[in-house]
Amino acid sequence: MTFYTQTKPADQLKLEVVAAVVTDAMRWDIDRWDRSRWDREEVPAGTLIFNAGMWNREKWIEETALTKWVDITGPCTHISVKRGVTTAGSIMYAHTGTLSVKAAAELDPRAAGILYGAQIRLKNTRNGQPIFTGFITDIKVEPGKKASDTAVTIEAADTVAKVASITRYGARPDGGRLENWESRVRRLMGSAPNVAYEIPSTSYALVCPTVWETSLAAHLDAATATVGGAWYCDRQGTLQICAYPPQQYKTNVALTDSYERTGKIDTWHYTDAKATWQAENIVSRVEATVHDAAPNDSGEWRAADYVAVAVEPTRATAWGGSTLKIDTLAPSRFIADEMAQTMLKEALDYPTVSAVAFWPVSQRIDNDQRQDRMNTAGLIDPLDLVEVIRDGDKSLAHITSVSHDITPYTWKTTLTLLPKEVIGFENLFTGPNSTR
Protein backbone atom coordinates (compact mmCIF):
# COMPACT_ATOMS: atom_id res chain seq x y z
CA MET A 1 0.00 0.00 0.00
CA THR A 2 1.45 3.35 -1.05
CA PHE A 3 1.05 6.66 0.76
CA TYR A 4 -1.47 7.83 -1.84
CA THR A 5 -3.72 4.78 -1.42
CA GLN A 6 -3.76 4.90 2.38
CA THR A 7 -6.49 6.56 4.46
CA LYS A 8 -6.41 10.29 3.79
CA PRO A 9 -8.46 13.46 4.35
CA ALA A 10 -9.90 13.27 0.84
CA ASP A 11 -11.61 10.01 1.85
CA GLN A 12 -13.19 11.44 4.98
CA LEU A 13 -13.89 15.17 4.57
CA LYS A 14 -16.57 16.92 2.57
CA LEU A 15 -16.78 20.64 1.77
CA GLU A 16 -20.31 21.79 0.99
CA VAL A 17 -21.94 25.09 0.04
CA VAL A 18 -25.55 26.16 -0.31
CA ALA A 19 -26.07 26.82 -4.02
CA ALA A 20 -29.01 27.23 -6.35
CA VAL A 21 -30.43 24.00 -7.71
CA VAL A 22 -28.95 23.58 -11.19
CA THR A 23 -31.57 22.66 -13.82
CA ASP A 24 -31.81 22.93 -17.59
CA ALA A 25 -33.73 26.19 -17.17
CA MET A 26 -32.19 29.40 -18.44
CA ARG A 27 -29.87 31.29 -16.06
CA TRP A 28 -28.83 34.93 -16.32
CA ASP A 29 -25.99 35.61 -18.77
CA ILE A 30 -25.03 31.94 -19.02
CA ASP A 31 -25.42 29.56 -21.95
CA ARG A 32 -28.85 30.03 -23.57
CA TRP A 33 -29.48 33.31 -21.73
CA ASP A 34 -26.14 34.82 -22.63
CA ARG A 35 -26.70 38.51 -23.37
CA SER A 36 -24.76 38.24 -26.63
CA ARG A 37 -27.60 36.10 -28.01
CA TRP A 38 -30.49 38.42 -27.16
CA ASP A 39 -33.01 39.82 -29.65
CA ARG A 40 -31.75 42.70 -31.77
CA GLU A 41 -33.37 44.91 -34.41
CA GLU A 42 -32.08 42.57 -37.08
CA VAL A 43 -32.67 39.02 -35.98
CA PRO A 44 -29.89 36.72 -37.22
CA ALA A 45 -30.33 32.99 -37.37
CA GLY A 46 -30.14 31.25 -33.99
CA THR A 47 -31.08 34.35 -31.95
CA LEU A 48 -33.23 33.83 -28.86
CA ILE A 49 -36.71 35.28 -29.34
CA PHE A 50 -38.78 36.17 -26.27
CA ASN A 51 -41.13 33.36 -25.20
CA ALA A 52 -40.20 31.21 -28.16
CA GLY A 53 -37.88 28.29 -28.67
CA MET A 54 -35.03 28.18 -26.16
CA TRP A 55 -36.34 31.34 -24.45
CA ASN A 56 -39.75 29.89 -23.72
CA ARG A 57 -40.93 31.16 -20.33
CA GLU A 58 -41.95 27.64 -19.34
CA LYS A 59 -38.26 26.83 -19.04
CA TRP A 60 -37.34 29.76 -16.79
CA ILE A 61 -36.25 29.28 -13.18
CA GLU A 62 -38.96 30.60 -10.86
CA GLU A 63 -38.20 33.42 -8.42
CA THR A 64 -38.58 30.91 -5.58
CA ALA A 65 -35.88 28.60 -6.93
CA LEU A 66 -34.72 26.12 -4.30
CA THR A 67 -31.21 25.83 -2.95
CA LYS A 68 -29.41 22.79 -1.62
CA TRP A 69 -26.11 21.72 -0.09
CA VAL A 70 -23.68 20.95 -2.91
CA ASP A 71 -20.45 18.96 -2.52
CA ILE A 72 -17.47 20.90 -3.97
CA THR A 73 -14.68 18.84 -2.39
CA GLY A 74 -13.34 17.24 -5.56
CA PRO A 75 -11.43 20.17 -7.13
CA CYS A 76 -10.11 21.45 -3.77
CA THR A 77 -6.33 21.34 -3.33
CA HIS A 78 -5.96 23.04 0.05
CA ILE A 79 -8.30 23.89 2.93
CA SER A 80 -7.31 25.89 6.00
CA VAL A 81 -9.47 26.55 9.06
CA LYS A 82 -8.88 28.71 12.13
CA ARG A 83 -11.30 29.20 15.03
CA GLY A 84 -11.04 30.44 18.59
CA VAL A 85 -10.14 33.41 20.75
CA THR A 86 -7.21 35.78 21.13
CA THR A 87 -5.70 36.51 24.53
CA ALA A 88 -4.41 39.54 26.41
CA GLY A 89 -2.93 38.26 29.63
CA SER A 90 -5.67 36.11 31.17
CA ILE A 91 -8.45 37.83 29.21
CA MET A 92 -9.90 36.16 26.11
CA TYR A 93 -11.54 37.95 23.20
CA ALA A 94 -13.59 36.31 20.47
CA HIS A 95 -11.88 36.11 17.10
CA THR A 96 -13.62 35.62 13.77
CA GLY A 97 -13.20 32.05 12.58
CA THR A 98 -12.07 31.67 8.98
CA LEU A 99 -12.02 29.04 6.27
CA SER A 100 -9.91 29.41 3.12
CA VAL A 101 -10.22 27.12 0.12
CA LYS A 102 -7.96 26.81 -2.90
CA ALA A 103 -9.31 24.84 -5.82
CA ALA A 104 -8.51 23.92 -9.40
CA ALA A 105 -10.26 25.22 -12.50
CA GLU A 106 -12.87 22.44 -12.33
CA LEU A 107 -14.64 24.47 -9.64
CA ASP A 108 -16.45 27.27 -11.48
CA PRO A 109 -18.30 29.25 -8.77
CA ARG A 110 -20.63 30.97 -11.22
CA ALA A 111 -21.62 27.82 -13.07
CA ALA A 112 -22.11 25.99 -9.77
CA GLY A 113 -24.37 28.73 -8.42
CA ILE A 114 -21.99 29.64 -5.55
CA LEU A 115 -22.69 33.17 -4.36
CA TYR A 116 -21.23 35.68 -1.91
CA GLY A 117 -22.84 35.20 1.50
CA ALA A 118 -23.81 31.57 0.89
CA GLN A 119 -23.53 29.09 3.73
CA ILE A 120 -20.51 26.80 3.69
CA ARG A 121 -19.39 23.92 5.90
CA LEU A 122 -16.56 21.44 6.20
CA LYS A 123 -17.58 18.17 7.79
CA ASN A 124 -16.27 14.73 8.62
CA THR A 125 -18.36 12.14 6.80
CA ARG A 126 -17.26 9.32 9.13
CA ASN A 127 -18.94 10.75 12.23
CA GLY A 128 -21.18 13.35 10.58
CA GLN A 129 -19.64 16.16 12.64
CA PRO A 130 -18.87 19.60 11.17
CA ILE A 131 -15.38 21.04 11.49
CA PHE A 132 -16.38 24.55 10.37
CA THR A 133 -19.69 26.28 9.59
CA GLY A 134 -19.90 29.79 8.21
CA PHE A 135 -20.70 31.94 5.20
CA ILE A 136 -18.74 32.96 2.10
CA THR A 137 -17.08 36.38 2.30
CA ASP A 138 -15.06 36.38 -0.92
CA ILE A 139 -14.74 34.44 -4.18
CA LYS A 140 -11.76 34.99 -6.46
CA VAL A 141 -11.03 33.41 -9.84
CA GLU A 142 -7.54 33.97 -11.26
CA PRO A 143 -7.31 32.91 -14.93
CA GLY A 144 -4.10 31.22 -16.04
CA LYS A 145 -2.45 31.13 -19.44
CA LYS A 146 -4.39 27.95 -20.05
CA ALA A 147 -7.91 27.28 -18.82
CA SER A 148 -6.61 24.39 -16.76
CA ASP A 149 -4.27 26.78 -14.90
CA THR A 150 -7.14 28.86 -13.51
CA ALA A 151 -7.03 29.11 -9.71
CA VAL A 152 -10.14 29.51 -7.55
CA THR A 153 -10.09 30.85 -3.99
CA ILE A 154 -13.06 30.91 -1.61
CA GLU A 155 -12.91 32.71 1.75
CA ALA A 156 -15.45 32.28 4.55
CA ALA A 157 -16.08 33.51 8.09
CA ASP A 158 -18.09 32.22 11.02
CA THR A 159 -20.87 33.85 13.05
CA VAL A 160 -18.46 36.02 15.06
CA ALA A 161 -18.08 38.21 11.95
CA LYS A 162 -21.83 38.86 11.87
CA VAL A 163 -21.86 39.83 15.55
CA ALA A 164 -18.87 42.15 15.02
CA SER A 165 -20.77 43.98 12.26
CA ILE A 166 -23.70 44.89 14.55
CA THR A 167 -23.57 48.19 16.46
CA ARG A 168 -24.98 48.19 19.99
CA TYR A 169 -25.89 51.46 21.71
CA GLY A 170 -25.41 50.64 25.38
CA ALA A 171 -27.36 48.31 27.67
CA ARG A 172 -29.07 48.64 31.04
CA PRO A 173 -31.89 46.93 32.94
CA ASP A 174 -35.49 48.08 32.66
CA GLY A 175 -35.34 49.25 36.26
CA GLY A 176 -32.52 49.94 38.70
CA ARG A 177 -28.82 50.16 38.02
CA LEU A 178 -27.27 46.66 38.04
CA GLU A 179 -28.37 43.47 36.37
CA ASN A 180 -27.41 39.81 36.42
CA TRP A 181 -24.62 38.77 34.05
CA GLU A 182 -26.76 36.26 32.14
CA SER A 183 -29.61 38.76 31.81
CA ARG A 184 -27.16 41.23 30.28
CA VAL A 185 -25.91 38.65 27.79
CA ARG A 186 -29.46 37.83 26.70
CA ARG A 187 -30.27 41.54 26.46
CA LEU A 188 -27.25 42.08 24.23
CA MET A 189 -28.12 39.15 22.00
CA GLY A 190 -31.49 40.77 21.36
CA SER A 191 -29.56 42.88 18.84
CA ALA A 192 -28.89 39.71 16.84
CA PRO A 193 -32.26 37.90 16.75
CA ASN A 194 -31.20 35.55 13.96
CA VAL A 195 -27.97 34.42 15.61
CA ALA A 196 -28.11 31.12 17.50
CA TYR A 197 -26.34 31.13 20.87
CA GLU A 198 -25.99 29.10 24.05
CA ILE A 199 -24.83 29.95 27.58
CA PRO A 200 -23.17 26.73 28.81
CA SER A 201 -21.90 28.33 32.04
CA THR A 202 -23.32 31.30 33.93
CA SER A 203 -22.27 33.63 36.76
CA TYR A 204 -23.77 35.26 39.84
CA ALA A 205 -21.98 38.48 38.94
CA LEU A 206 -23.78 41.78 38.48
CA VAL A 207 -22.77 44.19 35.73
CA CYS A 208 -23.07 47.94 35.45
CA PRO A 209 -25.30 49.90 33.04
CA THR A 210 -23.56 51.35 30.02
CA VAL A 211 -24.18 53.78 27.17
CA TRP A 212 -21.09 52.54 25.33
CA GLU A 213 -21.59 52.77 21.57
CA THR A 214 -19.57 50.00 20.01
CA SER A 215 -19.95 46.66 18.27
CA LEU A 216 -22.04 43.89 19.78
CA ALA A 217 -18.85 41.80 19.79
CA ALA A 218 -17.08 44.37 21.99
CA HIS A 219 -20.03 44.36 24.41
CA LEU A 220 -19.82 40.56 24.68
CA ASP A 221 -16.04 40.78 25.12
CA ALA A 222 -16.50 43.20 28.03
CA ALA A 223 -19.26 41.10 29.61
CA THR A 224 -17.20 37.90 29.51
CA ALA A 225 -14.01 39.69 30.59
CA THR A 226 -15.84 40.92 33.68
CA VAL A 227 -16.29 37.34 34.93
CA GLY A 228 -13.16 35.78 33.43
CA GLY A 229 -15.08 33.95 30.71
CA ALA A 230 -15.02 33.87 26.93
CA TRP A 231 -17.23 33.45 23.89
CA TYR A 232 -16.63 31.87 20.51
CA CYS A 233 -18.39 30.24 17.56
CA ASP A 234 -18.56 26.45 17.69
CA ARG A 235 -18.25 24.01 14.81
CA GLN A 236 -22.01 24.16 14.10
CA GLY A 237 -22.02 27.96 13.79
CA THR A 238 -23.62 28.56 17.22
CA LEU A 239 -22.16 31.12 19.64
CA GLN A 240 -21.02 29.68 22.97
CA ILE A 241 -21.01 32.43 25.62
CA CYS A 242 -19.29 31.14 28.75
CA ALA A 243 -18.92 32.69 32.19
CA TYR A 244 -15.96 30.36 32.68
CA PRO A 245 -14.17 27.77 30.51
CA PRO A 246 -15.04 24.06 30.74
CA GLN A 247 -13.58 22.40 33.83
CA GLN A 248 -13.86 18.83 32.52
CA TYR A 249 -12.09 17.02 29.71
CA LYS A 250 -14.18 16.67 26.55
CA THR A 251 -11.87 14.88 24.15
CA ASN A 252 -9.53 13.38 26.80
CA VAL A 253 -6.44 14.53 24.91
CA ALA A 254 -2.86 14.68 26.15
CA LEU A 255 -0.20 16.66 24.29
CA THR A 256 3.30 15.32 24.89
CA ASP A 257 6.82 15.85 23.57
CA SER A 258 7.77 12.23 24.26
CA TYR A 259 6.57 8.89 22.93
CA GLU A 260 5.45 7.59 26.30
CA ARG A 261 1.81 6.65 26.84
CA THR A 262 -0.07 9.04 29.10
CA GLY A 263 -3.18 7.09 30.07
CA LYS A 264 -5.37 9.44 28.03
CA ILE A 265 -7.56 8.02 25.29
CA ASP A 266 -5.85 10.26 22.73
CA THR A 267 -2.15 10.91 23.16
CA TRP A 268 -0.83 13.42 20.64
CA HIS A 269 2.93 13.58 20.17
CA TYR A 270 3.46 17.14 19.05
CA THR A 271 6.27 17.92 16.64
CA ASP A 272 6.58 21.64 17.20
CA ALA A 273 6.07 23.69 20.36
CA LYS A 274 6.33 27.40 21.07
CA ALA A 275 7.46 28.39 24.58
CA THR A 276 9.21 31.73 24.38
CA TRP A 277 9.81 34.36 27.06
CA GLN A 278 10.68 38.03 26.59
CA ALA A 279 11.12 40.65 29.30
CA GLU A 280 9.04 43.24 27.47
CA ASN A 281 6.07 40.85 27.45
CA ILE A 282 5.92 40.72 31.25
CA VAL A 283 2.79 42.54 32.40
CA SER A 284 3.72 45.12 35.02
CA ARG A 285 0.62 47.31 34.80
CA VAL A 286 -3.09 46.62 34.26
CA GLU A 287 -5.62 49.26 33.22
CA ALA A 288 -9.24 48.07 33.41
CA THR A 289 -11.67 50.55 31.85
CA VAL A 290 -15.17 50.23 33.32
CA HIS A 291 -17.82 51.44 30.85
CA ASP A 292 -20.27 52.61 33.49
CA ALA A 293 -23.21 55.01 33.11
CA ALA A 294 -25.29 57.20 35.41
CA PRO A 295 -28.25 59.56 35.02
CA ASN A 296 -27.53 63.30 34.96
CA ASP A 297 -29.62 66.00 36.65
CA SER A 298 -32.20 65.69 33.87
CA GLY A 299 -32.48 61.94 34.30
CA GLU A 300 -30.68 61.18 31.04
CA TRP A 301 -28.11 58.39 31.15
CA ARG A 302 -24.57 59.50 30.39
CA ALA A 303 -21.20 57.75 30.31
CA ALA A 304 -19.43 57.52 33.66
CA ASP A 305 -16.36 55.56 32.66
CA TYR A 306 -13.43 55.12 35.00
CA VAL A 307 -10.15 53.22 34.92
CA ALA A 308 -8.94 50.83 37.62
CA VAL A 309 -5.14 50.58 37.70
CA ALA A 310 -2.87 47.94 39.23
CA VAL A 311 0.93 48.21 39.15
CA GLU A 312 3.67 45.74 40.13
CA PRO A 313 6.66 47.99 41.00
CA THR A 314 9.13 45.10 41.25
CA ARG A 315 8.37 43.85 37.75
CA ALA A 316 8.38 47.36 36.35
CA THR A 317 11.80 48.07 37.86
CA ALA A 318 13.38 44.74 36.95
CA TRP A 319 11.90 44.11 33.51
CA GLY A 320 10.20 47.28 32.30
CA GLY A 321 7.25 45.20 31.17
CA SER A 322 4.07 46.11 29.36
CA THR A 323 0.61 47.49 30.14
CA LEU A 324 -2.47 45.28 29.76
CA LYS A 325 -5.60 47.27 28.85
CA ILE A 326 -9.07 45.73 28.99
CA ASP A 327 -12.74 46.79 28.87
CA THR A 328 -15.13 45.60 31.61
CA LEU A 329 -18.60 46.12 33.05
CA ALA A 330 -17.62 45.76 36.71
CA PRO A 331 -20.49 46.70 39.08
CA SER A 332 -18.36 48.80 41.47
CA ARG A 333 -14.96 50.44 41.83
CA PHE A 334 -14.03 47.86 44.46
CA ILE A 335 -14.66 44.98 42.06
CA ALA A 336 -12.82 46.82 39.26
CA ASP A 337 -9.78 47.33 41.49
CA GLU A 338 -9.87 43.68 42.56
CA MET A 339 -10.10 42.56 38.92
CA ALA A 340 -7.06 44.64 37.96
CA GLN A 341 -5.06 43.23 40.89
CA THR A 342 -6.13 39.67 40.05
CA MET A 343 -5.11 40.02 36.41
CA LEU A 344 -1.75 41.40 37.47
CA LYS A 345 -1.17 38.42 39.78
CA GLU A 346 -2.18 35.99 37.02
CA ALA A 347 0.27 37.46 34.52
CA LEU A 348 3.02 34.89 34.03
CA ASP A 349 6.71 35.73 34.34
CA TYR A 350 7.96 32.34 33.16
CA PRO A 351 7.74 30.51 29.81
CA THR A 352 4.89 28.07 29.16
CA VAL A 353 3.92 26.03 26.12
CA SER A 354 1.77 28.50 24.21
CA ALA A 355 1.36 26.59 20.92
CA VAL A 356 1.81 23.04 19.64
CA ALA A 357 1.47 21.39 16.25
CA PHE A 358 0.77 17.76 15.38
CA TRP A 359 -0.23 15.72 12.35
CA PRO A 360 -3.43 13.64 12.28
CA VAL A 361 -2.30 12.45 8.83
CA SER A 362 1.19 12.45 7.33
CA GLN A 363 3.65 9.99 5.85
CA ARG A 364 4.84 9.16 9.38
CA ILE A 365 1.38 8.28 10.77
CA ASP A 366 0.39 4.60 10.61
CA ASN A 367 -2.55 3.96 8.31
CA ASP A 368 -4.63 2.20 11.00
CA GLN A 369 -4.44 5.30 13.25
CA ARG A 370 -5.45 7.91 10.73
CA GLN A 371 -9.23 7.68 10.81
CA ASP A 372 -9.42 7.95 14.60
CA ARG A 373 -6.91 10.81 14.62
CA MET A 374 -8.93 12.74 12.03
CA ASN A 375 -12.12 12.09 13.99
CA THR A 376 -10.57 13.48 17.19
CA ALA A 377 -8.85 16.46 15.55
CA GLY A 378 -12.08 17.53 13.89
CA LEU A 379 -13.91 17.61 17.24
CA ILE A 380 -11.47 19.97 18.99
CA ASP A 381 -13.09 23.23 20.09
CA PRO A 382 -11.73 26.42 21.65
CA LEU A 383 -11.67 26.40 25.48
CA ASP A 384 -11.33 22.60 25.57
CA LEU A 385 -9.17 21.43 28.46
CA VAL A 386 -6.03 19.42 27.63
CA GLU A 387 -3.03 18.02 29.46
CA VAL A 388 0.35 19.33 28.27
CA ILE A 389 3.60 17.45 28.93
CA ARG A 390 6.95 19.12 28.25
CA ASP A 391 10.28 17.75 29.46
CA GLY A 392 8.35 15.48 31.82
CA ASP A 393 6.42 18.32 33.48
CA LYS A 394 2.62 18.06 33.31
CA SER A 395 0.19 20.98 33.32
CA LEU A 396 -3.38 21.75 32.30
CA ALA A 397 -4.24 24.28 29.61
CA HIS A 398 -7.24 25.55 27.74
CA ILE A 399 -7.13 25.62 23.95
CA THR A 400 -7.53 29.22 22.80
CA SER A 401 -7.48 28.55 19.06
CA VAL A 402 -7.44 25.57 16.74
CA SER A 403 -6.13 25.65 13.16
CA HIS A 404 -6.29 22.91 10.54
CA ASP A 405 -4.12 22.88 7.42
CA ILE A 406 -5.51 20.20 5.09
CA THR A 407 -4.62 18.85 1.65
CA PRO A 408 -6.12 15.77 -0.01
CA TYR A 409 -3.31 13.66 1.54
CA THR A 410 -2.16 15.45 4.71
CA TRP A 411 -3.60 17.15 7.78
CA LYS A 412 -1.74 19.38 10.24
CA THR A 413 -3.38 20.82 13.37
CA THR A 414 -2.00 23.71 15.43
CA LEU A 415 -3.32 24.66 18.87
CA THR A 416 -2.62 27.78 20.91
CA LEU A 417 -2.87 27.36 24.68
CA LEU A 418 -3.45 29.30 27.89
CA PRO A 419 -2.48 27.71 31.23
CA LYS A 420 -5.58 26.80 33.25
CA GLU A 421 -4.33 28.50 36.41
CA VAL A 422 -4.47 31.98 34.87
CA ILE A 423 -8.18 31.90 34.03
CA GLY A 424 -11.11 33.07 36.16
CA PHE A 425 -12.30 35.44 38.87
CA GLU A 426 -13.96 32.87 41.15
CA ASN A 427 -12.71 34.79 44.19
CA LEU A 428 -14.68 37.90 43.23
CA PHE A 429 -18.16 36.50 42.65
CA THR A 430 -18.82 33.83 45.26
CA GLY A 431 -22.58 33.38 45.34
CA PRO A 432 -26.02 34.68 44.41
CA ASN A 433 -26.01 37.13 47.34
CA SER A 434 -22.61 38.61 46.61
CA THR A 435 -22.94 42.40 46.51
CA ARG A 436 -19.34 43.31 45.80
Predicted regions and their residues:
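Acidic, small/polar-enriched beta strand-loop surface segments
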Residues: 1-73, 221, 225, 230, ...
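Surface-exposed cap/loop segments at beta↔alpha junctions
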Residues: 2-16, 34, 44, 87-88, ...
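N-terminal assembly/attachment segments of tailed bacteriophage virion structural proteins
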Residues: 56-57, 61-66, 70-73, 80-92, ...
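Well-ordered beta-strand positions in beta-sheet-rich domains
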Residues: 69, 130-135, 153, 323, ...
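Oligomerization/assembly interface segments of phage tail-like spikes and tubes
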Residues: 83, 87-107, 149-162, 223, ...
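Short, surface-exposed secondary-structure edge patches
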Residues: 106-113, 201, 373-379
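Charged- and aromatic-enriched interaction segments used to assemble
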Residues: 145-279
